[in-house]
Amino acid sequence: MKIGFIGLGNMGASLAKAVLQAKTGAQILLANRSQAKVDAFIADFGGQASSNEEIFAEADVIFLGVKPAQFSELLSQYQTILKKRESLLLISMAAGLTLEKLASLLPSQHRIIRMMPNTPASIGQGVISYALSSNCRAEDSELFCQLLTKAGLLVELGEGLIDAATGLAGCGPAFVYLFIEALADAGVQTGLPRETALKMAAQTVVGAGQLVLESQQHPGVLKDQVCSPGGSTIAGVASLEAHAFRGTVMDAVTKAYKRTKKLGK
């Protein structure tokens, strides 16, 4: 089997790395506008340098890591090749581009998976939501999960929920990074060294998230366990509530969701 990656930006490179780590035995073909980026990736992780044309002509599975605005131009350049190929599995990570839109850019025989990864996939801790086109085969989902087993949590959704998953998990790391930065800044403000504060803030978020997953308790229950009557934690929680912390986070996710939907139009 040949698996092609067109576009080695942050997400494309992260997923290519995960596929290589899965050790499926497939031949991994890599193409990017910057050849230097391809060469650097191969030096670090492996794979084989290729071209867009070669990938469209030879690969059985193609990951498309290009921006939404570039999709139409990219696929139109290789329509002749795509029309001659038997059914391929094409995997899009472009925010907002629906399966219907993607299908309109491709010959009808090709199957499509629309996915939305996030950046922690680069260390195997990502969240990857995905939806399959109606002509996908039963084994396509299994193959997709096999290829990306090293990338993190894989969640199959109805396509109507992919934009919502993008707002939450696709954009969510940026919101969490802001929170970590704010925690660290507060630590510095109260006397901690910067490096120490940053490590403590990041580990606090990692540990709290892991406890939610492993304990299977509601976050509100875990929060209450930390808040003793009249104590320091409840004083901090009260300040967050007074400044609409939860509402602000919900609004950020909702705005990201709405923006994602606009990107596909």
Residue ranges and their predicted role:
Residues A202-K265:
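NAD(P)-dependent Rossmann-like dehydrogenase/reductase catalytic/cofactor-binding core
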Residues M1-A57, Q125-G126, V188-Q189:
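NAD(P)+-binding Rossmann beta1-loop-alpha1 motif at the extreme N-terminus of oxidoreductases
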Residues M1, A26, G47, L88, ...:
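A structural micro-motif
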Residues L15, F45, N52-Y130, S134:
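Rossmann-like NAD(P)(H) cofactor-binding subdomain of soluble oxidoreductases
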Residues I28, V38, F71, P193-M200, ...:
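Small-residue helix-packing motif on alpha-helices
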